[in-house]
Amino acid sequence: MAAEAGGGEPLVKFVKLSGRAAGSKKKVRWFPVRRLFTHSCPSLRIPSRFLREGRRSPPARSGHRCVADNTNLYVFGGYNPDYDESGGPENEDYPLFRELWRYHFATGMWHQMGTDGHMPRELASMSLVLHGHNLLVFGGTGIPFGESNGNDVYVCNVKYKRWSKLNCRGKKPNRIYGQAMAIIHGFLYVFGGTTGYIYSTDLHRLDLSTREWIQLKPNNPPCDLPEERYRHEIAHDGQRIYVLGGGTSWTAYSLEKIHAYNFETNTWEDIPTKPYGNLGFPAARRCHSCVQIKNEVFICGGYNGLVILGDLWKLDLQTFQWTKLPALMPEPAYFHCAAVTPAGCMYIHGGVVNIQQNKRTGSLFKIWLVVPSLLELCWENLLKYFPHLCQLPTHQLLQLGLSQELIERLK
């Protein structure tokens, strides 16, 4: 059997603590994102499968991916076997979603983006990264899982709303899904994944300047390689790639010891991590989310083979110390997606929230992982009390004293 592939509150601010002991931790709070929606733009001439009228927010889904910049959250692909939730007869790609959505932070509105070009058809458990104004998509699977996998790189320029397939040479990875991917020093690294039947521990690298793939051959003996896996996540510090969790259809891997690929020595290393007091280590998991801010990595949710997890943990890549943050997902989920803005605000969307009922969600949540800067605090309050700013012309915004950078966030 093939492996599964799809699986207006105030900002945090200083408050008077009621008799809390010194050293106690302020509770981290989740905020449901404002649900204000717009209809998709009718003037774009694109195939109906790319843009379904009447959809004001992304339907519930799993196995999708998302990325974020200062202005938008981009959500691509996904899977939902529920015929009605997936759009019924309007969705030509049922049970998949061949669509790209963006959530505009300044207005709190969802837009289904009309795009030209060749959008990928492998829409579950693909990899997605943001590189400048470009979305890079690799791998993924169609339906049935494992029967129509991909190993091409697709690029969507979000400024011009156009898809293209990257012509690459060299030894491409196998047709896989559930792999992890990151851009480091101008190279696109891909690790692990599954064909649906066989799990991988391969590490590939694409030179984005020459567009040549190579398979890296670490110096370790075969017994010292990481276990084969899918639906793991990776982080990096410029010197090593760190593999976080993942597993197979029947197991989930521990986070007590982390596999790390050393660029300089071309070897895999095992790095023990430090427990968080009496709480110890995060539970083993797969199908979780992971975001990174400098040398801090945050993992959230996932599935350990028994229950859906809703916890939030931080790993310091300098000390390898785990810290459990005092926040729980309002809807514990796996096969969800998460992304963090440059300012340090994490957004989480979708996922499987009930195993017995095979239920998915379309909810969107945000949480600040760092103390927001004064600029960000002022900006959010400005948008809260003057929501009409997005409707003003640029020259008027400049007259009001807004910087060009902030004006760009309104568009």
UniProtKB/Swiss-Prot annotation:
Record key words, sorted: Kelch repeat, Repeat, Ubl conjugation pathway
Gene that produces this protein: klhdc10
Name of protein: Kelch domain-containing protein 10
Pfam families in UniProt: Kelch_4, Kelch_KLHDC2_KLHL20_DRC7
Gene source species: Xenopus tropicalis (Western clawed frog)
Superkingdom, natural source: Eukaryota
Positions annotated as Kelch repeat: 72-133, 135-186, 187-239, 240-288, 296-342, 345-388
Gene Ontology biological process terms, A to Z: protein ubiquitination; rescue of stalled ribosome
Pathway(s) where this gene product acts: Protein modification; protein ubiquitination
Family the entry assigns: Belongs to the KLHDC10 family.
